[in-house]
Amino acid sequence: MSVDIDTVKRVARLARIAVDEEDASRMTGELNAILGFVEQLNEVDVTGVEPMTSVIPTTMKMRVDEVTDGSKAEDIVANAPQTEEHFFLVPKVVE
């Protein structure tokens, strides 16, 4: 598969990215190089290779699940202009 300049412009338009003619031609070459590398990866025989998420088998460390208030209430409301009992006070906007 190869990418032409029209495809680059179309993808840029769909992504809402402004791309001028010079950048589009540069990106065409870069995308073709990336796709060439991916095609090389597709040629690798992975028959019998078990899928993995990490090179080294790891397990997540478990900790006790306990409920706390986070001890951050004062820090959270510290810069608020108005607070009351760790809640933000804001002007009423709906009658």
UniProtKB/Swiss-Prot annotation:
Lineage, top-rank taxon, reads Bacteria
According to its UniProt record, the EC number is: 6.3.5.-
For this entry, list what GO says about its biological process: glutaminyl-tRNAGln biosynthesis via transamidation; regulation of translational fidelity; translation
**GO molecular function: any one?**
asparaginyl-tRNA synthase (glutamine-hydrolyzing) activity
Matching InterPro entries, A to Z?
Answer: Asp/Glu-ADT_sf_sub_c, GatC
What are the record keywords, sorted?
ATP-binding, Ligase, Nucleotide-binding, Protein biosynthesis
Looking up Gene3D superfamilies in the UniProt record yields:
Glu-tRNAGln amidotransferase C subunit, N-terminal domain
Reactions catalysed, as given in the entry: L-glutamyl-tRNA(Gln) + L-glutamine + ATP + H2O = L-glutaminyl-tRNA(Gln) + L-glutamate + ADP + phosphate + H(+); L-aspartyl-tRNA(Asn) + L-glutamine + ATP + H2O = L-asparaginyl-tRNA(Asn) + L-glutamate + ADP + phosphate + 2 H(+)
Q: Which residues form the signal peptide?
A: none
Q: How does it assemble?
A: Heterotrimer of A, B and C subunits.
HAMAP family reported for this sequence = GatC
User: Per its UniProt record, what PANTHER family does this chain match?
Assistant: GLUTAMYL-TRNA(GLN) AMIDOTRANSFERASE SUBUNIT C, MITOCHONDRIAL
Family affiliation = Belongs to the GatC family.
UniProt protein name: Aspartyl/glutamyl-tRNA(Asn/Gln) amidotransferase subunit C
Q: Which gene encodes it?
A: gatC
